[in-house]
Each structure stands twice: as C-alpha cells, then as structure tokens.
C-alpha cells in the first residue's frame, strides 16, 4: 500500500466525474463485474476502470467509467469488454446524488466505496498492484463488495 494519505484518493482522486466511452481494441475479452451490498437501491453506482499504475485513482485518468442505477436491487452485474492485461476498478455510490463523494473532516468517505480485490484501505489509498486483476481470456468475473462509508 502506498504511503500517500488516504485523503489523496478522496480529495485529489476526484472519482466522480463524467463517464467516458469504453476503450476500443481488437483484443477484448468479456468480463463481468458483480457488485453487492449496495447501501441504496436507488442511488447511482459509478465504476471507474483503470489499466495503468500511473493513472490509478487520479481524476480523469481512468480508461473508462460506467454509471449503473440499481433499479431496486442490492446487487448487480455489469458486463464489459476489456483488452487483455492488468486492470483495477474503483467504485462509488453517491447516496445524495450531489455528484461527488462526501467525506468527513479528515477526508474519509462517508458514502459507500470499494475497489477490485475487495481491498479495504485503512490509512492510505490502495495502489494499483493491490487492486489489479488480470484479463487473460474470456469469462473473467470480478466480484466486489461495496463498503459503506463511516
């Protein structure tokens, strides 16, 4: 885990933002991301897909993002096509729909968030290596359990 303050993820990370189109590649594989333990069955869940260590958790540096409405459910599956290689996912759920992650006075999220590999940061933001998974063939399933904010 990097020693960067967890606040970097929350303040400088700027996870919430406009969605971007999926990457285009001729060598993509079907991947299913399953997200469970949603706190709200109506608030939008945003998924940010990263494929570089340098851009991980940096505002606007994700390869692409997706927004999903839970439609009354506490879990969902999102099929995506990803180029082969290393990937990591960061997830947020904007409970009050203000298009940002709300934080307490020390910068810890008060709204739900999660990372691939179900990494649970304590004092510092996770790094790409902790969250990465390998896309090396079809049928990959990435299961992520949302962590409620404080």
List each language-model region with its residue ranges.
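Beta-strand signatures of extracellular beta-sandwich domains
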Residues: 46-50, 90
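A short tyrosine-centered beta-strand micro-motif
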Residues: 85-91
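Bacterial Sec-dependent signal peptides at the C-terminal "C-region" and cleavage site
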Residues: 6-27
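Short proline/glycine- and polar residue-rich coil/turn motifs
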Residues: 67-74, 135-136
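A short, amphipathic beta-strand motif
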Residues: 29-37, 47, 144
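Exposed aromatic-hydrophobic patches
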Residues: 75-82
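Extracellular beta-sheet/turn segments enriched in Thr/Pro/Gly and aliphatic residues
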Residues: 112-149
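Acidic, glycine-anchored loop motifs typical of Ca2+
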Residues: 95-103
């Amino acid at each position: 885990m990097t020693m960067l303050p967890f606040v970097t993820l929350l303040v400088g990370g700027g996870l919430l933002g406009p969605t971007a189109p999926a990457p285009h590649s001729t060598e993509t594989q079907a991947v299913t991301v399953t997200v469970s333990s949603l706190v709200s069955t109506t608030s939008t869940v945003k998924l940010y897909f990263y494929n570089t260590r340098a851009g991980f958790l940096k505002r606007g540096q994700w390869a692409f993002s997706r927004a999903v409405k839970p439609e009354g459910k506490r879990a969902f599956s999102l099929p995506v096509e990803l180029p082969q290689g290393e990937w990591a996912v960061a997830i947020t759920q904007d409970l009050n729909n203000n298009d940002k992650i709300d934080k307490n006075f020390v910068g810890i999220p008060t709204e739900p968030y999660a990372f691939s590999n179900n990494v649970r940061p304590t004092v510092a933001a996770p790094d790409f290596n902790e969250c990465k998974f390998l896309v090396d063939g079809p049928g990959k399933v990435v299961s992520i359990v949302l962590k409620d904010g404080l």
